[in-house]
Amino acid sequence: MEDDMWCVSSSGSSRSYRSETAAKYQSGPYQDLEEFEEVDDDIAVEYPCPFCASDYDLVELCHHIDEEHRHEANNGICPVCSKRVKMHMVDHITSHHRDVLKSEQKEMSYREDPYLSDKYLQPHLDELPPSMNHHQHPSKHVSDQFLSFINNSALPNQTKLVLPDSSVEDKNPIKDSSAAKEGTSSCPLSDSDKLEKAKKCEFVQGLLSSAMFDDECDSSE
């Protein structure tokens, strides 16, 4: 009988202990600890430098190798695939592990990193054989086809020729002749022409004055 009472009391105490423990984890510092563990899960993976004992995430590792081990980086073991490469380590990572770099770009927000830009990656992708160059985006090919379609569709508009208007051609000789007349009339006179013109004016003035003088004489008589 006493054993049964002890079992009942022990089971009740264990249930109460579990409920109290669960309440502690649902509130207070234990809840903060769980949030901290969730944050730790989102931290980017660090890779060991193949030339020293330092650990970096993949983007920082590319910077580190390019700045600190530039001359010795042509032969080493890749920290991502654990294979020995016989090319520059940064070139190998940017060409063969581009997906990992892109994922770290989203997690760590390396938006302006030169090692993640197409300007840096494209030369390395062009050097690879077609069987290995599987990182090219199909969207670029589609955009090129769209641009070529636009350029080809604009060609018929460019082939239209503007025919000259016959009425405009008919008016041009008239304008040219009138312009020629104006040019001849506006030419400056020579000295001999000016002298002859002055003599004619004096002769006309003399005739007018003599005619006026004769009229006055007749009226006086």
UniProtKB/Swiss-Prot annotation:
InterPro entries listed in its UniProt record: DI19, Di19_C, Di19_Zn-bd
Record's GO cellular component terms: cytoplasm; nucleus
Region of interest (Disordered), residue spans: 1-24, 162-193
Post-translational modification: Not phosphorylated in vitro by CPK3 or CPK11.
Main location: cytoplasm
Induction text: By high-salt stress, but not by abscisic acid.
Signal peptide positions on this chain: none
Keywords, sorted A to Z: Cytoplasm, Nucleus
Subcellular location: Cytoplasm; Nucleus
Tissue: Expressed in seedlings, roots, leaves, stems, flowers and siliques.
Similarity annotation: Belongs to the Di19 family.
Record protein name field: Protein DEHYDRATION-INDUCED 19 homolog 2
